[in-house]
Amino acid sequence: MPRVSAPLVLLPAWLLMVACSPHSLRIAAILDDPMECSRGERLSITLAKNRINRAPERLGKAKVEVDIFELLRDSEYETAETMCQILPKGVVAVLGPSSSPASSSIISNICGEKEVPHFKVAPEEFVRFQLQRFTTLNLHPSNTDISVAVAGILNFFNCTTACLICAKAECLLNLEKLLRQFLISKDTLSVRMLDDTRDPTPLLKEIRDDKTATIIIHANASMSHTILLKAAELGMVSAYYTYIFTNLEFSLQRMDSLVDDRVNILGFSIFNQSHAFFQEFSQSLNQSWQENCDHVPFTGPALSSALLFDAVYAVVTAVQELNRSQEIGVKPLSCGSAQIWQHGTSLMNYLRMVELEGLTGHIEFNSKGQRSNYALKILQFTRNGFQQIGQWHVAEGLSMDSRLYASNISDSLFNTTLVVTTILENPYLMLKGNHQEMEGNDRYEGFCVDMLKELAEILRFNYKIRLVGDGVYGVPEANGTWTGMVGELIARKADLAVAGLTITAEREKVIDFSKPFMTLGISILYRVHMGRRPGYFSFLDPFSPGVWLFMLLAYLAVSCVLFLVARLTPYEWYSPHPCAQGRCNLLVNQYSLGNSLWFPVGGFMQQGSTIAPRALSTRCVSGVWWAFTLIIISSYTANLAAFLTVQRMEVPIESVDDLADQTAIEYGTIHGGSSMTFFQNSRYQTYQRMWNYMYSKQPSVFVKSTEEGIARVLNSNYAFLLESTMNEYYRQRNCNLTQIGGLLDTKGYGIGMPVGSVFRDEFDLAILQLQENNRLEILKRKWWEGGKCPKEEDHRAKGLGMENIGGIFVVLICGLIVAIFMAMLEFLWTLRHSEASEVSVCQEMVTELRNIILCQDNIHPRRRRSGGLPPQPPVLEERRPRGTATLSNGKLCGAGEPDQLAQRLAQEAALVARGCTHIRVCPECRRFQGLRARPSPARSEESLEWDKTTNSSEPE
């Protein structure tokens, strides 16, 4: 059968002439709220009738008549009596009532018996058990469709827990689809029924205590508004609660009394504001209310009035189409007879085929007489009024405009003051030095304060910082409640928790977190255990005292062996006068006891000496000693760098396993913090063992704050388990603290918000923006760096101080003092055994000191023993020598006259030796060769004998 579509104003005159009266088409309307200052149902019927009758296309004088009957009570008797008054008038349809379910059921039964169409304009009651009459049509959307639409919204917002407030017990049957979805998905839906007092306050308090954030209100417009006002009084109208109204008159609610415009209130609307007559219809209602009422009861047309308006048009359209196929007539009926209207069934068939656009949108019915193929607009309350953010269609389902919804949330943050709960914790939040002179947010400083300023600048909101009452981050109690900042968020006492609040799975179940603004992990903080402080003789530290002792013994042993070997081997005995090889009976050994002690010293100091080993045995001793000193010096040099450039720490533990395997060092964490929860819930064997130790240790190893933990580390044998960021901060400011090992886990700090916070996505985007702009890293460097302790890499480049190598200067000074003292002893000893002099010892010493200061008198007579003769230069015999002579410095003295050569040689008094007759200078005895010297009278006979021996063998 083809669908029927007809304009509402094209009503031919012949259609109007088929009624029982040749001049009218009669429709009956039953109103249960006939007051002028109510929903405006009477006015809407009048407007529909007049608009149809004023249509210029209408021919003749026939017109539509609507008889209005008032129903004072929802009574079966009065309803039946009213119907008995309507049937004799010969009506083609009965409309209403709008708010009397019992009366509506009686009317449907009577109309069904007489086969007169009946239009309902109220939601069905007892949908599952009531038999829908064929003659009954319902313009009001079914509760089943509304239930499916609510379920779609809950799915869109990922709501896993919700509370359904019912004004009547029948709502459990009406919203069966919604209940079934929660049963299938295993989500939580609590149902609360209003009591007979109709006071929702106790019910709302229970919902608040249950921490339920999504509330579905299934009640009429008046009761829904009352519930919302009571919720506002309890502080439940905020950004952390979501209200969903199933009443289709949501757009008529007055929200002016709501203080917090951040509340997320959603509802449905079926009004078609694009309809050509909608504005005129609304203006007429408002004008009527203003003229006849003390106040305007609604902000727009009530749903029942719009449905009655559309019902009149639907009946007229169906009658028009029916009359095209057959002539219809209407005759009076009676309650006392079994007579029916013969055209009633045909008209019902045409009514089910009607399609038109009315004030409530598209009008179409299914085979059951229920409205179909329509759409519900989803509205959200904003500071600018109600805004459509999506729609639900019977066939297409839910479609939401996420951009509009997000923009409403962003706009709701504008110029909004958020309560921020936090805790004093360096460097996240600290009191300024002069905080007594300030008030409000100006009293605080720190990383979180700066980050809040950045976020407020991006999202354009205001904030008020408030310290948490109990001074803890938040842990669950045995009764299921939470303490600290987490507890305040759950109780909706704060909008944000901005601090070093760790994101954990347990906390995520009860509050929402933003994206992490800082990544960290648990670390071990322990005090620095330094070895003995560096002293002046710390250059001896590379070797232990035992090594130094064995080195001394090795030195003495080598000296003794060298002295012994040099005495035994014949190759270390040689003639002191190589010029007289084979003619001198004297042999000399250079390894005296003093030289044997000096030679190893020169090798050990890598300076060498003038003593060179001749024999293989002495060279073997020398080589072994040099190899020994090479290894010793190399080892000393390598170890000296480690000992003097880096202060070595003596740490008894190096990892978390070392800490868990011992009991001498106590360890613990902050009570009620995320680190404590980490160890408590960990399944790793080492961490479980650590938790058992911390939990059972008495006195308790847990601390209340980070400052208390730091003090305990410094003043006792205690290791503190805390976040790596705090570890880094305090190590920068106390050089006696160090981190042991690496991180025990990886986690992040986030901004806490109550469950269901509509600002979560906005803060996520703002945090990502700060990270991309590197603002968070800049803030961290600002508050973490600048400590008095240098970075660890700076220790390697630190110069050595006097406390490290001052001892070597002490050794040098002592050696110089000993050398001066020995020189004075030698000076005095020489003077005492020299020839008698008229000059005193003091004068001699003064003279030498003066020469030293003036750098003069490098040559002076040799001091001889008492009774000895003073040395005199040798007298050279004048004879013609060879043309040249080689001096001791390796230079050639020119040929010239013999006298000149002799005079030149005589000037080299220090190089002229006794008994030498050669002009060449001997490299061993440094004597001249080639000239014969006359012995002076003071020369002994032994010297003269030596001259004779040497001269007799020399060629002339």
From Swiss-Prot:
Tissue specificity field: Expressed in the hippocampus and cerebellum (at protein level).
GO molecular function: ligand-gated monoatomic ion channel activity involved in regulation of presynaptic membrane potential; signaling receptor activity
Name of protein: Glutamate receptor ionotropic, kainate 4
Biological classification of the source: Eukaryota, Metazoa, Chordata, Craniata, Vertebrata
Quaternary structure, from the entry: Homodimer. Can form functional heteromeric receptors with GRIK1, GRIK2 and GRIK3 subunits. Forms a heteromeric complex with GRIK2.
Signal peptide (UniProt feature, chain positions): 1-20
Topology, Extracellular side: 21-545, 645-804
Gene3D superfamilies linked to this entry: 3.40.50.2300, Periplasmic binding protein-like II (3.40.190.10)
Subcellular localization(s) per the UniProt record: Cell membrane; Postsynaptic cell membrane; Presynaptic cell membrane
Keyword Transport: yes
Highest taxon listed in the record's lineage: Eukaryota
Keywords: Cell membrane, Cell projection, Glycoprotein, Ion channel, Ion transport, Ligand-gated ion channel, Membrane, Postsynaptic cell membrane, Receptor, Signal, Synapse, Transmembrane, Transmembrane helix, Transport
